[in-house]
């Protein structure tokens, strides 16, 4: 039995995923994580550094790493890449002025060797706000169709209501699970 098969069998028993949540500041990363964990979202502070939460979802243990998105913290993102199974990239779909910056940061991340093979879930958050950019336009600006190095999918969502969050996380778990675990 090859080494890779042994590793896959070990991970199959653990059924654990490491998920990194990144995006520009004020995109809604922490609110999305708290909503998914069914925690209160009425008092959210900017994440200075990182926060780790663990939740069981779809027979998996998800270790969610919420990392601050302020410009001064982005150079530290690379410290969290190791052993990442999936990347959730959160976009503020109401922030037209920073969409190009958002695209540039995502492109840098996708070039990182330690993130190679990680599934990419793009969450176009704040889709409920007036003037929010539609998901197809966001996909176009982010040039998602050109991504060949990662499995990816984009969902519009609303962190405050939780709209489409379970659907998005289900896709992510199914995608990662089909690649790195021996499914029953």
From Swiss-Prot:
Q: Which UniProt keywords apply?
A: Cell cycle, Cell division, Cell membrane, Cytoplasm, Cytoskeleton, Developmental protein, GTP-binding, Lipoprotein, Membrane, Myristate, Nucleotide-binding
Does the keyword field hold Cell division? yes
> What is the annotated localization of this protein?
Cytoplasm; Cell membrane; Cytoplasm, Cytoskeleton, Microtubule organizing center, Centrosome
This entry's Gene Ontology molecular function terms read: GTP binding; GTPase activity
Q: Which CDD domains match?
A: Arl2 (cd04154)
Q: Which cysteines are joined by disulfide bonds?
A: none
The record ties this protein, via InterPro entries, to: Arl2, ARL2/3, P-loop_NTPase, Small_GTP-bd, Small_GTPase_ARF/SAR
Q: Which residues bind GTP?
A: 23-30, 66-70, 125-128
Q: Which Pfam families match?
A: Arf
**Keyword DNA damage on entry:** no
What processes in GO biological process is this protein linked to?
A: cell division; cortical microtubule organization; embryo development ending in birth or egg hatching; female genitalia development; protein folding
Q: Which GO terms describe its cellular component?
A: centrosome; cytoplasm; microtubule cytoskeleton; plasma membrane
Annotated lipid attachment (N-myristoyl glycine): 2
Task: Report the sequence similarity comment from the record.
Answer: Belongs to the small GTPase superfamily. Arf family.
Q: Which PANTHER family does the record match to this protein?
A: ADP-RIBOSYLATION FACTOR-LIKE PROTEIN 2-RELATED
> Which NCBIfam families does the entry link to?
small_GTP (TIGR00231)
What this protein is reported to do is described as: GTP-binding protein that functions in embryogenesis, cytokinesis, germline development and microtubulule cytoskeleton dynamics.
The protein's name: ADP-ribosylation factor-like protein 2
Native species: Caenorhabditis briggsae
